Amino acid sequence: MENLTVETQNLTSLDNGSIEEKNGPTVDEVQEWLISYLSQLLDLEIEEISTSTSFNRYGLDSSASISLTSDFGDWISKEIDPTILYSYPTIEAMAEHFGA
């Protein structure tokens, strides 16, 4: 995980404008974004990402966690503390927390 650059503009067809218009992303949109992000970050196929597997099991170190939460926060236009991954340790949990 040396290169933590993820092309967030290419993650999905979702964009900030549509999120802001409806007061935040849906649970499904959050899951789709996180799956796409991890797929790119970890060089895995989307099918290899499980919404119920903990971020720790994917081997995210602190640097990757900071990148993920920063990029996710940019996507939803909110500042996200990287320690949120301890409270919501799976894609499913994050989606339930942040999804509308």
From Swiss-Prot:
Residues 1-16 have a biased composition (Polar residues). Residues 25-100 form the Carrier domain. Keywords: Fatty acid metabolism, Lipid metabolism, Phosphopantetheine, Phosphoprotein. Residues 1-25 are annotated as: Disordered. Its cofactor is pantetheine 4'-phosphate. One of its GO terms (molecular function) is phosphopantetheine binding. Pfam families: PP-binding. It comes from the Bacteria. InterPro entries: ACP-like_sf (IPR036736), PKS_PP-bd (IPR020806), PP-bd_ACP (IPR009081). The keyword Phosphoprotein applies. Induction: Part of the jamaicamide (jam) biosynthetic gene cluster, encoding enzymes catalyzing most or all of jamaicamide biosynthesis. The keyword tRNA-binding does not apply. The modification O-(pantetheine 4'-phosphoryl)serine is found at residue 62. GO terms for biological process: fatty acid metabolic process. Carrier protein involved in the biosynthesis of jamaicamides, which show sodium channel blocking activity and fish toxicity. Accepts as substrate the activated form of 5-hexenoic acid from JamA. This is Acyl carrier protein JamC. It comes from Moorena producens (strain JHB). The gene is jamC.
